Amino acid sequence: MINIRKTHPLMKIVNNAFIDLPAPSNISSWWNFGSLLGICLIIQILTGLFLAMHYTADTTTAFSSVTHICRDVNYGWLIRYLHANGASMFFICLFLHVGRGLYYGSYLFMETWNIGVLLLFAVMATAFMGYVLPWGQMSFWGATVITNLLSAIPYIGSDLVQWIWGGFSVDKATLTRFFAFHFILPFIIAALAGVHLLFLHETGSNNPTGLQSDADKIPFHPYYTIKDILGVLLLILVLLSLVLFSPDLLGDPDNYTPANPLNTPPHIKPEWYFLFAYAILRSIPNKLGGVLALVLSILILIAAPLLHTAKQRSMMFRPFSQCLFWILVADLLTLTWIGGQPVEHPFIIIGQLASILYFTLILVIMPITSLLENNLLKW
């Protein structure tokens, strides 16, 4: 009798995606982050669901309801900090996943890559709205500053901002709609992740060499299921270490002060995972220019396949491109640091130079270097 796993309509889909899936025999631990992102999403949806049972999306009670979760709900503190630090783990995995894609040329799977960029935007939107919900000082002022950026859009800008706010300032209407969107978006992300996977399985996975791997495939289970479980255990270890030893390490102390529209915090800054984009935004003195640079800093990923001038797919055998890639990583870390600093000398000029380098590397230096490598290899 044939195995039910291969015949049952539902189990067949799972089987073809996670069990009998032919995978390249040489994919490294950099290929673990897809499954880790799936685990992060599940953790966020589950913890978020339990938080939503006790949270109230009202300006007068939102802050107190979060305090109530931490003090009075059984293991509420654990659920809350798992959710907050789970977001940080989510972004660490996201950045590593995208970095892997750039390094090994995975962006040449166009559909998978474009859905991935869309997913990145969706996760960033979700995280931003989630940060507003505790209604602390940084929640309120972060929401005010970031939504206000839309007023830079010519002609419709100010109307658009008021439409998003649901009034003339960030208030009850804003908080309620942000909660509604924050609740629904993770499910949209889950659906998009399914489409992401669907497109990936049309082509099969890339591998570190960037060469065709059809001649040497192995079944996903047990080889990569075991490998993924190791990754998951390490992820959970890091997450629990954060949650149980220093849950507020990545947060902002200002968010333990209830939101007050009459008192602006000295340094308004977003969560650490947005700091690189925030630094790029601040490095341009013009409002519209800053907003465009902010959006383009992530939207530029869409252009990755168009900027691929190398004859080889992966950077594995391209040492010059490798050097530039790691310079880009260092540049992003510099931008992240600058985003958390006050707007004063020498941080302004460092931020501006790092922003220029970011765009120049991606748009000019890396494509030209790839062409140079083609010539050096006589391709």
UniProtKB/Swiss-Prot annotation:
Keywords: Electron transport, Heme, Iron, Membrane, Metal-binding, Mitochondrion, Mitochondrion inner membrane, Respiratory chain, Transmembrane, Transmembrane helix, Transport, Ubiquinone
SUPFAM superfamilies for the chain: a domain/subunit of cytochrome bc1 complex (Ubiquinol-cytochrome c reductase) (SSF81648), Transmembrane di-heme cytochromes (SSF81342)
Transmembrane segments: 33-53, 77-98, 113-133, 178-198, 226-246, 288-308, 320-340, 347-367
Residues annotated as binding heme b b562: H83, H182
Places the protein is found: Mitochondrion inner membrane
Source organism superkingdom: Eukaryota
InterPro entries referenced in this protein's UniProt entry, alphabetically: Cyt_b/b6_C, Cyt_b/b6_C_sf, Cyt_b/b6_N, Cytb/b6-like_sf, Cytochrome_b, Cytochrome_b_C_euk/bac, Cytochrome_b_N_euk/bac, Di-haem_cyt_TM
Sequence similarity: Belongs to the cytochrome b family.
Subunit (UniProt): The cytochrome bc1 complex contains 11 subunits: 3 respiratory subunits (MT-CYB, CYC1 and UQCRFS1), 2 core proteins (UQCRC1 and UQCRC2) and 6 low-molecular weight proteins (UQCRH/QCR6, UQCRB/QCR7, UQCRQ/QCR8, UQCR10/QCR9, UQCR11/QCR10 and a cleavage product of UQCRFS1). This cytochrome bc1 complex then forms a dimer.
Further remark: Heme 1 (or BL or b562) is low-potential and absorbs at about 562 nm, and heme 2 (or BH or b566) is high-potential and absorbs at about 566 nm.
Biological role: Component of the ubiquinol-cytochrome c reductase complex (complex III or cytochrome b-c1 complex) that is part of the mitochondrial respiratory chain. The b-c1 complex mediates electron transfer from ubiquinol to cytochrome c. Contributes to the generation of a proton gradient across the mitochondrial membrane that is then used for ATP synthesis.
Identification of the protein by name: Cytochrome b
Provenance organism: Megasorex gigas (Mexican shrew)
Lineage: Eukaryota, Metazoa, Chordata, Craniata, Vertebrata
Gene: MT-CYB
